[in-house]
């Protein structure tokens, strides 16, 4: 009888180990999507993807609504001042000055101090600060900071929100994409 109990206990061990390991793995997952070493190298080398990547272009982020018409894309990674900026920029072949130029930039910023929307106005981003006239709007369940794009970002609309403490998401859409910006924002999942 003892041998049968031992065998039964040994047979159950792999199942128990699997059940116990899953919650432990979930606890180890980073709360903010981080670029792989390969993505950091691609960004440093200014590698271009032709054709552009799809909904999972940013590891750990899903962009469910990407408008059509993009011909290339590029990973953008920037590490500075204790934060990591990680994003993807989709674009078409039109000149940047063209009013029909299509560009979309989705970025996740791992910034441990980020807890509220008001902090985005003084965020230490290298590109894309909320320094102009901003408005707060609601998109789905998210409170979003919005401003007109200018300067290095180009024309269009620049938006951002705190997804959860320490995680900021920003989206820059060129003028032809602005009518669908709400759908783009609603489709972003971390």
What residue ranges belong to the model's regions?
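Short, solvent-exposed recognition patches
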Residues: 29-156
């Amino acid at each position: 009888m003892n041998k049968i109990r031992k065998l039964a206990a040994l047979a159950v061990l792999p199942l128990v180990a699997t059940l116990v390991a899953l919650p432990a793995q979930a606890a180890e997952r980073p709360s903010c999507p981080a670029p792989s070493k390969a993505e950091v190298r691609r960004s440093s080398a200014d590698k271009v993807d032709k054709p552009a990547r799809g909904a999972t272009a940013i590891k750990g982020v899903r962009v469910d609504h990407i408008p059509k018409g993009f011909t290339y894309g590029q990973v953008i990674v920037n590490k500075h001042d204790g934060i990591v900026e990680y994003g993807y920029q989709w674009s078409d072949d039109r000149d940047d000055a063209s009013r029909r130029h299509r560009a979309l930039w989705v970025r996740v910023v791992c910034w441990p101090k980020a807890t509220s929307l008001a902090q985005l106005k003084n965020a230490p981003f290298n590109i894309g600060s909320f320094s102009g006239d901003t408005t707060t709007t609601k998109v789905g369940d998210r409170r979003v900071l919005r401003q007109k794009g200018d300067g290095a970002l180009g024309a269009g609309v620049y938006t951002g929100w705190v997804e959860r403490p320490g995680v900021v998401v920003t989206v820059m859409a060129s003028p032809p994409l602005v009518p669908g910006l709400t759908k783009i924002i609603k489709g972003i999942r971390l």
